[in-house]
A protein has these predicted regions:
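Charge-biased low-complexity segments
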Residues: 26-244
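Bacterial N-terminal signal peptides that target proteins for export
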Residues: 2-18
Length: 244
């Protein structure tokens, strides 16, 4: 099956404590063959002070970029599997990874995504969790990266929808979706759906504002898959909704 693989993004490296915020930036540059990550302007990170080294860790920028680069072919294979099921699958996905002091991933989650396929997202998370990361210095570290995937230009894109077009079925499902979120202790979630001509979801993807959202993702995706929405007409639609 013919499709275009466009992988682009930027790596954000920070010195962080367990509760420190992360600020990321994105960049873009297409790669015609095997997808490669292209970085935006270098992110400046400060060295931890003597008083804070017990709480925060610094990471070597070049080594973290290299780790994402090594993972990119496997991320692309996850996407290829998704395209086999959904030919017009595409969108941007942003990951956040917490790296333990031994260089393993303590956790990884989808921070934001318009990809719309949980199976593909889960496959990519598995790749990142298995990736060997550079060891942070002075504590644990965080890294973020955004990637954009685009299907072949031969594929007709789905019709864009707004949440209001999901109608009464979605309104009735909101309490169950909010229960998924609250039981996991997560903050805001976002779900992206492809809806077939019969109103049934073809696939559902879920992103979250924090790592606890991963515990809610399958619950949310499962609940949305059971709903029959209004028909989008003669072609599939795509929509994103916030769950908070």
């Amino acid at each position: 099956m013919k499709f275009t693989r466009l992988l682009r993004g930027s790596t954000t490296l920070v010195a962080v404590s367990a509760l420190a915020p992360v600020l990321g930036c994105g960049g873009a540059a297409p790669e015609p063959a095997a997808p490669e990550m292209v970085d935006a302007e270098p992110v400046q990170t400060s060295r931890p002070s003597m008083s804070s080294r017990s709480e925060i860790g610094g990471m070597n920028e070049e080594k973290v970029q290299a780790a994402f680069q090594r993972a990119s072919p496997r991320l692309s294979r996850c996407y290829e599997k998704g395209v086999e099921r959904i030919p017009y699958l595409g969108g941007e996905i942003r990951f956040k990874v917490r790296v333990a002091e031994d260089g393993t991933a303590r956790w990884a989650f989808v921070k934001d995504s318009t990809l719309g396929d949980r199976d593909t997202e889960a496959c990519m998370l598995k790749v990142l969790k298995a990736t060997r990361w550079p060891k942070p210095v002075g504590g644990e570290g965080l890294a973020e990266n955004s990637f954009t995937f685009e299907p072949s230009s031969d594929e007709r894109p789905p019709v864009p929808w707004t949440p209001d077009q999901l109608g009464t079925p979605y309104k009735k499902a909101r309490p169950a979706l909010e229960s998924c979120r609250s039981q996991a202790g997560a903050s805001q979630l976002k779900a992206t759906l492809y809806i077939d001509t019969d109103g049934k979801p073809l696939s559902v993807g879920v992103s979250s504002a924090d790592e606890r959202g991963e515990d809610a993702a399958e619950c949310v995706a499962g609940a949305l898959r059971e709903i029959t929405f209004p028909s989008p007409g003669s072609y599939a639609s795509k929509v994103s909704v916030d769950i908070d």
